[in-house]
């Protein structure tokens, strides 16, 4: 190993440890590593002549000039605006009526409604799953459809878009990884969304089957935070014309991102134009605009890119990839290879709660291994990225932790539902990735 490889490994380990042990707030560990890259480049730069680009400020903070990062950042502003429309209120109203009816058919209908909501807000929307949990705990107990049969499946359904029109975050991560890996191939957003649909289909299939494995008992009592989340969107609605402009801005931004290969640079700034319009017509104030433009997830995404670049440019990713490829040999079927990396990525993401950071670590390795074995790496690039949002089998962070606590599940009850779900989702994900991107 060269000195550059060793220092790249130091940066990577430092980031993982900071994320794993919550040393710094979410989004900051990669930024700290960007600073570390500059320090290491200044101290050891002369001893790393093999690097084509020095580890300076422009290199360490290149994520903040990345096209995809800015497209994603602007789209976060649009998402904040769309959540102020009556769309979410309508979802709440429909869910409340279905819970009153009760029964298995209502359960399936609730899954579909929540997954349609996720189609708009995208995978991993904290505000959406908090809203879903808040709605479930505030519903009166009913033997027809007890809250314990809703908490886990509906919470996880908020992470699975039925019609994946908003895959901006995950797509942006995948595109950034491909760029840092030096691959000239591009991923059309439509094909990426199709693989996402396979993942959602796997969840839906298990959610329907797993209904009978869920316990029947009351859930936790609602807290003040639950009440606030539930009625947050029930204040005065915005004028009809503002709501119409907001919805148009959302649709136009989605279409622009889908047509990135056709529109080129314009597709990256159209969400920015739409975001500025939201500020001009006062759908959002400046603080809301700023907080979403530079949200922790954006800082995380921008900060992880230089770390991934270090691994690729130093040759460490290729070295590890070739070593793994040699170790496993050419007899490993592509599907099994995909499954191994999706299990690794999803497990680390499940335990750390850092989907973007973990995806940025494992996806380049999966790409390098596929290249070493002569496989098309596109399926790995998409499947491994999406697998970071497909853990949920441990009640450690965020969504699964809230579902476990608020649903009053025992660990046996929790695992009885989540572990088979985990396996089924990854099988569907890997199969879908190989169908859309043959290896």
Model-derived features: positions:
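Alpha-helix N-cap/start motif
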Residues: 57, 147, 189, 286, ...
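Re-entrant/interfacial helical elements at transmembrane boundaries that shape
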Residues: 92, 125-140, 151-155, 165-182, ...
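Juxtamembrane and boundary regions of transmembrane helices in multi-pass small-molecule transporters
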Residues: 7, 143-152, 159-236, 386-439
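Hydrophobic transmembrane alpha-helices of multi-pass small-molecule transporters
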Residues: 1-71, 77, 191-322, 422, ...
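Alpha-helical transmembrane segments and their helix-entry boundary regions
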Residues: 26-30, 69, 107, 126, ...
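Transmembrane helix-bundle signature of multi-pass membrane transporters/permeases
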Residues: 77, 112-116, 131-135, 152-163, ...
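Membrane-embedded alpha-helical segments and adjacent helix-loop junctions characteristic
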Residues: 46-145, 292-373
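Transmembrane alpha-helix interface/packing and boundary motifs in multi-pass membrane proteins
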Residues: 15-24, 114-123, 155-165, 256-262, ...
């Amino acid at each position: 190993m060269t000195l550059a490889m060793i220092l790249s490994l130091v940066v990577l380990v430092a980031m993982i440890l900071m994320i794993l042990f919550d040393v710094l707030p979410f989004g900051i560990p990669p930024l700290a590593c960007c600073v570390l890259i500059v320090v290491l480049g200044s101290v050891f730069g002369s001893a790393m002549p093999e690097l084509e680009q020095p580890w300076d400020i422009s290199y360490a903070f290149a994520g903040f000039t990345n096209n995809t990062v800015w497209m994603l950042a602007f789209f976060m502003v649009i998402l904040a605006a769309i959540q102020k429309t009556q769309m979410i209120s309508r979802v709440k109203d429909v869910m409340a009526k279905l819970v009153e009816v009760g029964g298995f058919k209502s359960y399936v209908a609730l899954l579909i409604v929540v997954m349609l909501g996720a189609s708009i807000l995208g995978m991993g929307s904290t505000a959406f799953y908090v809203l879903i949990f808040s709605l479930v705990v505030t519903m009166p107990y009913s033997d027809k459809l007890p809250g314990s049969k809703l908490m886990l499946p509906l919470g996880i359904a908020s992470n699975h878009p039925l019609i994946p029109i908003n895959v901006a975050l995950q797509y942006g991560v995948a595109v950034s990884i491909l760029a840092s890996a030096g691959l000239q191939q591009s991923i059309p957003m439509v094909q990426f969304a199709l693989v996402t649909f396979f993942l959602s289909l796997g969840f839906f299939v298990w959610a329907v089957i797993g209904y009978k494995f869920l316990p029947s008992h009351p859930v936790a009592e609602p807290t003040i935070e639950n009440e606030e989340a539930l009625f947050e969107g029930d204040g005065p609605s915005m004028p009809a014309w503002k709501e119409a402009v907001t919805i148009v801005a959302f649709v136009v931004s989605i279409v622009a991102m889908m047509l990135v290969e056709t529109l080129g640079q314009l597709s990256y700034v159209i969400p920015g134009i739409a975001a500025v319009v939201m500020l001009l017509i006062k759908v959002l104030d400046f603080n809301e605009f700023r907080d979403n433009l530079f949200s922790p997830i954006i800082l995380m995404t921008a900060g992880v890119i230089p770390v991934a670049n270090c691994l690729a440019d130093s040759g460490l990713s290729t070295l590890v990839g070739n070593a793994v490829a040699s170790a496993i040999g050419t007899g490993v079927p592509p599907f099994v290879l995909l499954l191994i990396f999706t299990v690794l990525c999803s497990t680390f993401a499940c335990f750390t709660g850092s989907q973007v950071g973990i995806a940025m670590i494992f996806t380049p390795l999966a790409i390098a291994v596929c290249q070493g074995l002569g496989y098309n790496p596109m399926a790995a690039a998409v499947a491994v990225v999406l697998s970071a949002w497909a853990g949920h089998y441990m009640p450690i962070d965020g969504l699964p932790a809230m579902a476990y606590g608020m649903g009053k599940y025992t660990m046996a009850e929790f695992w009885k539902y989540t572990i088979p779900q985990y396996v089924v989702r990854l099988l569907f994900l890997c199969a879908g990735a190989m169908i859309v991107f043959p290896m």
